[in-house]
Amino acid sequence: MKILKFGFAFTLALFMTAALTAQAPMGVDYFLLGEHSKAKMFFEKELASNPEMANFYLGQIAYLEQNAQKAEEYYKKGLSANPNSTYNAIGMAKLQLKTDPKGGESALLAIAKKNKKDIDVTIAVGRAFMTAGMYKQAEKIHAEAKKAAGKNPAVYVLEGDLIFASNNMATEKAGEAGGKYEMATYFDENYPLGYLKTAQIYQKINAVLATQKLETLVEKNPNYTIAYGMLGRLYAQRGFYDRAIEAFKKYFDTGIYSTDDIEMYARVNYFSDLYDKARELVNNGLKNDPNHFVLNRYNMYISAKSKDANGLKDAEKFFSLRADTGYISLDYSMYAVILDNAQRYKEAFAQYDKAISMDPSNVDIYNDAISSARKRKDYTLAASYLNTQIEKKAELGRANDPDYADDIVDITALGYDYYSAGSSISKAPELAAEYMKDKSIIDMLAMADPSLSAAQLASNVEYFTKAYSLYYLQKADGMFDTLIARVPDSYTGHRYKALTQHAINDDTELGLAKPHYEKVAVILEKVDELTATNRRVLLEAYNYLGYYFYMKNDKDNTILYWGKVLEIDPQNANAKLVLDAMKNEGK
């Protein structure tokens, strides 16, 4: 590098132009916030209209990217545009610090001395020392700036940056640095960078405060679009997706955003179930970075949620990006949904199992597997997943509460899955045939009832179906006993107990369901205003009881219950038929 060739002839012309920061505040603020890729986009657009400023900041970015040669090229171009450019002179002096530390330091101090009445130049010199790691010199320059302009907000931003930089960006210094950034807005409540820096430093330790700072900023200056990007991220972080979307809309209107911004904007749309917009954003990001891991992740997720025909292709692309590392349980769960949508059930459940094995304590991860099994009418598998989920919930619950009890909704659902498994198997011969090939199921049935023949279970569909049905109906019966014990005054447990007993033996004359339907009737008859569901269940109970007493030739109770049916359903054909027959018998 021929840095010394330019020597510091620059020092002969330090009567300089107006501060660059005043000419392009948003681009400069991007740079000072560490958003270098966005600052670069901004200044590349400014090269033709403002080459002095644009080349200086592009040189600054190149310097921070450890590309001294490129930085020198930019600074020289800035000087070519304006040979009296103080800021590009500062850039060249900063480069000189690497090859001639004393010469570079002297050059920077000369610039500061010559421009001591220009606080922006003084601050720029302080930043040059700071980015070169010369913190003592930077602090000295900062002290001079503070003495000369103690109410200038940029002085306090530099002070906050120095606190961080000189302490290796230690998080324990966040409060101290944040205090300096807040001083910037204290002295100038309309100074955007002060709010941005404060929000940036607090976003991980106090997201509420960070959000408030940015909301204050956009209230004062609604057109300061940089703030909306950070505000969108904070809203997303706090789960306020509607607000995040509105903020990102304004931010993206600037045309200056990164692939990571696209990913975050796509994320909040995805979690708001706005899959079309999320897909549009993902596709936009993938045009520039087709192998972006997170964008490909959301591409697959969107396909899963929207049942996109290209889901399998999207999943294949996503899982090709890394060699089985960096994937999370939800990735496999979403892949399972895609396989499920493609009716590749065995593969789907294998992926659900993989997802669960990666994060077994995440009780929510079982939900899609349970739903998928029910959709396939594989209630046995649904019950298996649900039972494991209940056990995990109990394990977590007891860790915090020794008196933890299983959720009533879960008990009901598990009982119903058992009931459905037992009552529907006779209507699912393909599923029965599949189960018969599973030795673990054969062994389970034989162990539960030693009188059963394992050979018959494995070869005779009717024999297997009957044994399988009884096994799960008895499990359902036990679950509904638990439900009744927990909530005896609810009709639900009694009703399901009635259904289960009837499924075990549907001979109404035996009346296995009778006492349970009688209990249903007693409970619902006490309800002042019946819902449509209440009326339907009560009608179900009266129908069963009316038919039971009819089969028992109990005329009084037959008339009683079929009469109750007509009170609920005046046009009920069965009730009319039975009651008419009773009247005719009495003639």
Which positions does each model-derived feature cover?
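N-terminal secretory signal peptides that target proteins for export/translocation
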Residues: M1-I3
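Bacterial N-terminal signal peptides
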Residues: G7-A18
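Alpha-solenoid helical-repeat scaffold
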Residues: Y544-Y547, D556-I559, A573-N574
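Alpha-helical oligomerization segments
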Residues: E567-D580
